[in-house]
Amino acid sequence: MNLEKFIPNKTALITLIAASLVVIISLGIRQTFGLFFFDFEIDLGCTQTEFGFAMGIQLFFWGLFGPLFGLITDKFSGRVAVFIGFLFYLAGIYFLNYGPNTGFWFTFDLGILIGIGLAATAISIPISIVSKHFPLNKRTIAIGVVTAAGSFGYFVSPIYTRFFLLEFGWNPTLLIFGAMILAGLVISLFLNTPMTETKQQNENTQTAMQAIKEAFSNKSYNYLTLGFFVCGWHIALVAT
């Protein structure tokens, strides 16, 4: 494929690269938490049940806050949504490292804060930002690039995380994660919204409740949502 024909403009290219880096950081870190379990068990007294519960809560808040960050994206911009998401993500990593991080607070840090962060930084919001920069005949490929970046994050992050854990321990590894998320905060500033899309947002008078009613009146949307509890939730827990 001719790259010049695929990329509409410089802004689209920058946004595509930024979105890809965002999901590499976000999904990559998320995929490594299972490697920390034995350290959490020894140093924090975390049981398998507590760890599994925290990860389940993380998935729940990931899904619960997705529509809210979608609303923020429509109302303000995807850049704002992802930036806020990385702040929650960073807070979760910070408290997981420095405390409070035992008992309820373990679930709060790993489950709630990081779950909220994932709702904005994982795959949905970055894909929606990128798709607005590309015409329909090229949009699928652009989305595929971002999705592939997320898969790359899944693949490579357990490798370097295992190395860091063996060489430095879990606390320094979480510090490295914090530095990566700080980089993600900077990268999120390069997620641009097309001017035409901004004008359409300003002209859109649909309220959040109207959008929710419209979504739940669509059978396909309801089936897709129910399907998550069969596939997405279980697969994510198994992968962890």
Give the positions of each predicted feature.
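Extracytoplasmic
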Residues: 14-48, 66-69, 238-240
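Extracytoplasmic gate region of multi-pass secondary transporters
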Residues: 33-37, 219-240
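Intracellular juxtamembrane helix-capping segments at the cytosolic ends
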Residues: 40, 120-134
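Central cavity-lining transmembrane alpha-helices of secondary-active solute carriers
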Residues: 56-71
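C-terminal ends and interior cores of transmembrane alpha-helices
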Residues: 87-101
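Hydrophobic core of transmembrane alpha-helices in multi-pass small-molecule transporters
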Residues: 103-121, 229
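Helix-loop-helix hairpin linking two adjacent transmembrane segments in secondary transporters
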Residues: 146-196
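Flexible cytoplasmic inter-helical loops of multi-pass small-molecule transporters
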Residues: 192-211
